[in-house]
């Protein structure tokens, strides 16, 4: 009887369940979208119960549709949209407010106040993060401050906090396990990434009671078992957890110091494994925990690009220049260059290494000879320039020259982007056969804990190259193009909203 690992990939817009066999191949997929709530400008929320219902639905569907029995599931791994915050009543199991999503800016005033009080460096030193609404800590404070009776309930020990991984493990285990893993804890602004403990000083600054917080565990461990009524009468080990970007790093078998993966999703995320050393960034990168396994943690440097694949969606839905995302490649390759056109897609500001929330998108270098093809090509190239910005910051902070770049996410199917990426960073770009690396990473973590895979070496053998893109551009051309990009970014920052 063939066994599988079930991976739950709980994302920002949908929940997916994917079955993996021992070779790390996909044996079945189910997906379900859920509703986004926008109660005010800049606020983004989810209904945590809707997320839970969607997860139950995809788990059921992937098992039924692929004629797999529940007793063929050796373990469950969970990967999740990071930072999204749930606070619930531990007796009733009901959330006391919507889940506040990572994108939501509703805690901006809390962050500003803490900065004015001079605590920014304290948070940076202990957590490796910026004092930004992006992270979970200020979201918990906001819920306790704004939901009637919440703070009193929290002080009395009646409320629990969790990121989405914690919420799902708690529900799946029938309320038995209130846990998170090192990678998710490191995104909360409340966890000391050096001591590997919840930090009392930070909790005091955020006025969050410690009794609400989950126990922090390794990313690969049996945390508990599914309660039988949620899983066809079976008690299946819940055995792996990691935040989405860290799971992708693991799924790409980036186990060695200096290994790098880049995800081209709606936004872009680059992570470098820095081994057992938490590298302090001087270049606007985040220092975070990659994963905890075998009794130790691996750290990572992370760079965030706010607009990556969503720039292609903009060409399709906003400007109607293309009918489908793949069409962008054929337009881009009809011309040999952009003829000096640069698109800076700072639609929601600029991420790493600039961290400029006031910047807005801009186009430079237009002439009467500029055609649609030049514009589309310039938009695709912007994904690659932004990646070089992040990679240079990583090399500078870590002292490691990146030897190859493993890639995943929707935009990696675009061969033009992959080749231009290799050219502009002067590094080989490696596209794997299995591009569901986030779900695969969670599966690997769970599989290691239950003996489905023996070791990381076992997993590394599963990684297979689909195509390698080597740099072909000469040095002079590469640097000239990149200088133009830097100039365009600088000009974009000059032209800010008032």
From Swiss-Prot:
One of its GO terms (cellular component) is cytosol. Belongs to the FGGY kinase family. ADP binds at residues 12, 16, 266, 309, 410, 414. Activated by phosphorylation and inhibited by fructose 1,6-bisphosphate (FBP). It comes from Staphylococcus aureus (strain MRSA252). CDD domains: FGGY_EcGK_like. The phosphoenolpyruvate-dependent sugar phosphotransferase system (PTS), including enzyme I, and histidine-containing protein (HPr) are required for the phosphorylation, which leads to the activation of the enzyme. GO terms for biological process: glycerol catabolic process; glycerol metabolic process; glycerol-3-phosphate metabolic process. It comes from the Bacteria. It catalyses: glycerol + ATP = sn-glycerol 3-phosphate + ADP + H(+). Glycerol binds at residues 82-83, 134, 244-245. ATP binds at residues 12-14, 266, 309, 313, 410. Keywords: ATP-binding, Glycerol metabolism, Kinase, Nucleotide-binding, Phosphoprotein, Transferase. This is Glycerol kinase. Key enzyme in the regulation of glycerol uptake and metabolism. Catalyzes the phosphorylation of glycerol to yield sn-glycerol 3-phosphate.
């Amino acid at each position: 009887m063939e066994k599988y690992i079930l991976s739950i990939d709980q994302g920002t817009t949908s929940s997916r369940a994917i079955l993996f066999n021992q070779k790390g191949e996909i044996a079945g997929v189910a997906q379900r979208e859920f509703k986004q709530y926008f109660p005010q400008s800049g606020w983004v929320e989810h209904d945590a119960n809707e997320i839970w219902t969607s997860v139950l639905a995809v788990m059921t569907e992937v098992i039924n549709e692929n004629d797999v029995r529940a007793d063929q599931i050796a373990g469950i791994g969970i990967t999740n949209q990071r930072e999204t915050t749930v606070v619930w009543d531990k007796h009733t199991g009901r959330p006391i407010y919507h889940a506040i999503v990572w994108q939501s800016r509703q805690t901006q005033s809390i962050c500003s106040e803490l900065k004015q009080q001079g605590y920014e460096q304290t948070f940076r030193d202990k957590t490796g993060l910026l004092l930004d609404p992006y992270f979970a800590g200020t979201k918990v404070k906001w819920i306790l401050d704004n939901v009637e009776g919440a703070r009193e309930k929290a002080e009395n020990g009646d409320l629990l906090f969790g990121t989405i991984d914690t919420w799902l493990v708690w529900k799946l285990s029938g309320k038995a396990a209130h846990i998170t893993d090192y990678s998710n804890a490191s995104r909360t602004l409340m966890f000391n990434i050096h001591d590997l403990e919840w930090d009392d000083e930070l909790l005091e600054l955020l006025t969050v009671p410690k009794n609400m917080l989950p126990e922090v565990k390794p990313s690969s461990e049996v945390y508990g078992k599914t309660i039988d009524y949620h899983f066809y009468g079976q008690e299946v080990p819940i055995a792996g957890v990691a935040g989405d970007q860290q799971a992708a790093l693991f799924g790409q078998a980036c186990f060695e110091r200096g290994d790098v993966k880049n995800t081209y999703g709606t936004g872009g995320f680059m992570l470098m494994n820095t081994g057992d050393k938490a590298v302090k960034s001087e270049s606007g990168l985040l220092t975070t925990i990659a994963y905890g396994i075998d009794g130790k943690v691996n750290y990572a440097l992370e760079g965030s690009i706010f607009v990556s694949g969503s720039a292609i969606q903009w060409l399709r839905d906003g400007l109607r220049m293309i009918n489908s995302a793949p069409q962008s490649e054929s337009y881009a390759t009809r011309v040999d260059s952009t003829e000096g056109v640069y698109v800076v897609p700072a639609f929601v500001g600029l991420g790493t290494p600039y961290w400029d929330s006031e910047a807005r998108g801009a186009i430079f270098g237009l002439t009467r000879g500029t055609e649609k093809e030049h514009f589309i090509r310039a938009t695709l190239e912007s994904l690659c320039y932004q990646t070089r910005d992040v990679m240079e910051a990583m090399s500078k902070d870590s002292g490691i020259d990146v030897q190859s770049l493993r890639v995943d996410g929707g935009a990696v199917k675009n061969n033009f982007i992959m080749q231009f990426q290799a050219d502009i960073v002067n590094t080989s770009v490696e596209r794997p056969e299995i591009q569901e690396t986030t779900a695969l990473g969670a599966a690997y973590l769970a599989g290691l804990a239950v003996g489905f895979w023996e070791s990381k070496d076992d997993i590394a053998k599963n990684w297979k190259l689909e195509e390698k893109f080597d740099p072909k551009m000469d040095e002079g051309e590469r640097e000239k193009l990149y200088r133009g990009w830097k100039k365009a970014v600088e000009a974009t920052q000059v032209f800010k909203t008032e």
